[in-house]
């Protein structure tokens, strides 16, 4: 077993001291320490065709500066309706409102949940979802966590309005380790929308692990729009565990400006379970991004769909890996995926790799992929109608992404994405 030296400013004692100061239970303190010991023995996430070994995933202080209140940027982002809203700045809670508390809904920071509902957190924290030993960055998230969210909807409760969260990092040279747990108990329904935001070109790192549990016959709509700045090195690991007859829909906008590694994986463990992953991205500048989207079929009659469209500008590079794995025993399952990449310049690079892995008979599966440069004839036609090249490219980009954006199940995510896409294209 190879061990690497990590440039961390903390050790076992410091991790335990911080956890104890926060009032965490002994099992969580031990989990933090064990994860810290494990991290140097683990490899970075496996990434195709992009070298991430030199990326600054671990340097940066985990002691985040205290900020209070809602900044003008956050005010503009959340608007007037704040009844079901949680906001953290530098990992610290600055606003929380849960109008569904009377129905038993828990919507709070992970730290508060550890104090008030430790048994629930222990049940779901890195047990069935993301594993501590998956890779080095997952282990570091478990060890160094300095932000997080816990959302739990009880059995039979069906929420009619989205629960929303905004997480900002506003400190250069800082490292945010955020961990979210989203649980829809049996026969419940919820919509959860999150936005990760950071500012400035100064170096900082963001490590996010999100675990979504959809119990029997429950339904979750998960929306995420990430707009981390050019200085952010980002690792984002989102995992869904979907039980019998349950449904999970991902609606994701990967709109960071810095180097990014994302993993969105769904485990369809129950019979007749369902997942649908839709994502769009716009890369620009010299950023490098790697997107791994995977659906694992374990339950009979499970259905999984993946649809990703990406646009690359300037000298940006993005790799899209889509995998549908139908395991032995998952008969009558259906796995379908499509990845499409459009490049707007000679220096832009994109790659789409659809993969089908099938270990069962009596199943359906299909994939499609395309990578290509913008059609100059199409641009010429638009420009002949009086548009500038920039305006023509803008229309082409919106048209290319529209088949995904229009199908997103959450209207507010659609609206937010259109705004962000417009900003990145211009």
PLM region spans:
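Short, low-to-moderate order helix/coil transition modules at the start of elongated helical scaffolds
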Residues: 1-209, 216-219
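Conserved beta-strand/loop scaffold segments within soluble protein domains that form the structured core
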Residues: 106, 117, 122-387, 401, ...
């Amino acid at each position: 077993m190879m061990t690497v030296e990590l440039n961390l400013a903390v050790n076992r004692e410091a991790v335990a001291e911080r956890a104890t100061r926060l009032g965490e239970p002994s099992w969580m303190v031990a989990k933090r320490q064990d994860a810290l010991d494990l991290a140097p023995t683990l490899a970075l996430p496996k990434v195709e065709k992009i070298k991430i070994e030199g990326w600054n995933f671990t340097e940066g202080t985990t002691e985040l500066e205290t900020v209070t209140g809602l900044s003008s940027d956050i005010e503009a982002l959340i608007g007037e309706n704040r009844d079901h809203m949680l906001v953290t700045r530098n990992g610290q809670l600055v606003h929380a409102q849960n109008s569904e508390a009377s129905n038993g809904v828990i919507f709070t920071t992970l730290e508060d949940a550890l104090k008030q509902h430790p048994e629930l957190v222990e049940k779901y924290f890195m047990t069935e979802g993301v594993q501590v030993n998956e890779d080095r960055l997952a282990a570091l998230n478990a060890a160094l966590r300095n932000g997080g969210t816990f959302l739990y909807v009880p059995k039979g409760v069906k929420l009619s309005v989205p629960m929303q969260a905004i997480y900002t990092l506003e400190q250069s040279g800082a490292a945010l380790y955020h961990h979210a747990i989203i649980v829809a108990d049996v026969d419940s329904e919820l919509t959860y929308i999150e936005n990760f935001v950071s500012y400035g070109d100064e170096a900082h790192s963001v490590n996010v692990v999100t675990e979504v549990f959809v119990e029997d016959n429950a339904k979750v709509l998960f929306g995420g729009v990430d707009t981390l700045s050019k200085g952010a090195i980002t690792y984002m690991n989102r995992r869904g565990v979907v039980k019998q007859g349950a449904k999970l829909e991902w609606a994701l906008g990967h709109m960071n400006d810095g180097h990014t590694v994302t993993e969105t994986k769904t485990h369809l463990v129950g019979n007749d379970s369902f997942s649908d992953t839709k994502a769009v991205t716009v890369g620009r500048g010299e950023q490098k991004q790697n997107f791994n989207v995977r659906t694992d079929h374990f339950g009979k009659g499970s259905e999984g769909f993946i649809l990703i469209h990406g646009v690359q500008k300037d000298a940006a590079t993005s790799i899209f890996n889509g995998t549908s794995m139908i395991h032995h025993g998952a008969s009558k399952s259906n796995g379908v995926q499509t990845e499409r990449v459009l490049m707007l310049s000679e220096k832009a690079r994109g790659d789409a790799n659809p993969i089908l892995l099938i270990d069962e008979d009596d199943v359906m599966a299909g994939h499609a992929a395309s990578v290509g440069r913008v059609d100059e004839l199409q641009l010429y036609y638009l420009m002949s109608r009086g548009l500038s090249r920039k305006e023509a490219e803008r229309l082409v980009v919106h048209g290319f992404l529209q088949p995904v954006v229009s199908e997103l199940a959450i209207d507010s995510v659609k609206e937010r994405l259109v705004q962000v896409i417009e900003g990145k294209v211009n």
